[in-house]
A protein has these predicted regions:
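CBM-like, beta-strand-rich accessory domains located in the C-terminal region of large
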Residues: 1-146
């Protein structure tokens, strides 16, 4: 990427990091932005991922789709629920991943953290129509209490 930006904000209740890059500009004529917010009161992480087309190509991108992938560590198991994905973390901890916009599916992937022994893992994939979402996907990861 030629252009990258990062900004950080901190308050007593929230920490925010916003990042953007144009790595896909040459091939797809888009820039990407991710806003991560950690709510220190509600103990959750929220994300907003956005695709920005070059102005003159906005109408061409309308029929495209965007996809986000979240690869889970091998020690984390997951179950799809009606409103998201329940993540079970070692130590009897549970987190709930939810999203707004698009369709979520679970797929197989490969973890190469231990280079000698690749492991099969699960990844969560959210795919959304740019036209329906205006190029945005919102997601949230929060503690789940039974």
């Amino acid at each position: 990427p030629r252009n990258t930006t990062i900004s950080c904000e901190n308050s007593i209740t929230e920490k925010i990091v916003e990042l953007s890059h144009d790595a896909y500009k040459k091939d797809y004529h888009i820039s990407v932005n991710r806003r991560l917010s950690m709510d220190l009161v509600k103990n959750c992480v929220m994300g907003k991922d956005t695709v920005f087309p070059e102005d003159n190509l906005k109408k061409n991108l309308i029929d495209s789709s965007m996809m986000l992938s979240f690869h889970l560590h091998p020690s984390i198991s997951c179950k799809k629920r009606r409103n998201g994905v329940l993540l079970e973390i070692p130590g009897d901890k549970k987190m709930l991943f939810t999203h707004k916009g698009g369709n979520l599916r679970l797929e197989k992937s490969t973890y190469t953290g231990n280079f000698n022994q690749p492991q099969e893992i699960t990844k969560m994939v959210i795919e959304n129509s740019v036209k329906q979402s205006e190029g945005k996907i919102n997601w949230k990861l929060e503690e789940f209490i039974d």
